[in-house]
């Protein structure tokens, strides 16, 4: 640590740990309703930020989507859902099933109804199901912005759910009173709370239709995310608490990344932005790659995103069962060649569809996170540095050979090292040092960073 302390600041990752330790214990509030009644707008209003994908097209939200929320000092989880229709078909039927699961598993439910449209057959069907659930149910009469809207809201008493809360999710009207009522009915701890403490956060990322939702469903053992043959059927990050190998993991299943965020349109653009945020909020990322197809620029870009974010990395080659035996050995060599810069990444060949080798993902994540958490004491680190630089000194630059005076590990998560030198170190030499660090200390599955601080010349002392 230097005198000004600029290189040693562990407060960020310690705060991360405390936030993670709190997850899983909060009660859950599900927000349900027909398509395009304003559920995601209400969720964003509750959160005080844009998290849920919102667009003026019915059915933009297709999954149950969980977000951590805070209101008047009380923690809870708000669960956005796809539009609920009792007689839906195809993909919309799958979405309706997700909303039905949310109704059953939440600690309280907010049913959102468009006050201007009035109670529809779908609203009445939802009300009947909710009344049978025995859960606290709150009726939110949305899009109330006038006296006529107040009258429209009052007409929703007919649903039998008690007094309608007249709100405008768009403008915030009435939302505070609604939340006060909801929180008063919530238990201190959710029924489905995890008792194992803070789960490690995992982001599932990859290009569209590579099998992220299928993998999540295989791990969870239920139809947790909407899976359909159309590419990109998951458009929001979906948090799932899943017990694997005796530990609870928090999976974030993200929308498939488009070729370029700037080229995506509508809700696909917003979903791409949320994918970036999912990687940032995770500790380890599983990058799914289609083993039956050549590695693409999209695949490489996703891997780069994870490395740039400094997250532990597992490469999961999905659809391995579709690769011929004769092709597999050749494919392994191709992977080594194309991903030469990330040979340190954990690699697992799986089939999300059949479950082949999926169990190997947990030890791969555990190893990657152990490397990500690693701290090397200053003594052994500088002993290693002395031996390496004696055998291979830094290259001469501008007629002078820089010396490395001292090294320290500034932070973990990812492991970040600072070298104090008398001159600039070439990028190639820094990569050499990174390779030697990995050979000696491991770090399999984790990016590491090597930063250089050039010692400033001190002014001569006054006599």
UniProtKB/Swiss-Prot annotation:
Binding locations of GTP 1: 33-40, 80-84, 142-145
Keywords from the named record: GTP-binding, Nucleotide-binding, Repeat, Ribosome biogenesis
Domain KH-like: 374-456
Binding site for GTP 2: 206-213, 253-257, 318-321
GO MF term list: ATP hydrolysis activity; GTP binding; ribosome binding
GO cellular component, one term: plasma membrane
GO process terms (BP): ribosome biogenesis
Domain EngA-type G, chain residue ranges per copy: 27-190, 200-373
Xref: PROSITE patterns: G_ENGA (PS51712)
Main function: GTPase that plays an essential role in the late steps of ribosome biogenesis.
Subunit structure: Associates with the 50S ribosomal subunit.
Family stated for the protein in its record: Belongs to the TRAFAC class TrmE-Era-EngA-EngB-Septin-like GTPase superfamily. EngA (Der) GTPase family.
PANTHER family named in the record: GTPASE DER
Protein name: GTPase Der
Native organism: Mycobacterium tuberculosis (strain ATCC 25618 / H37Rv)
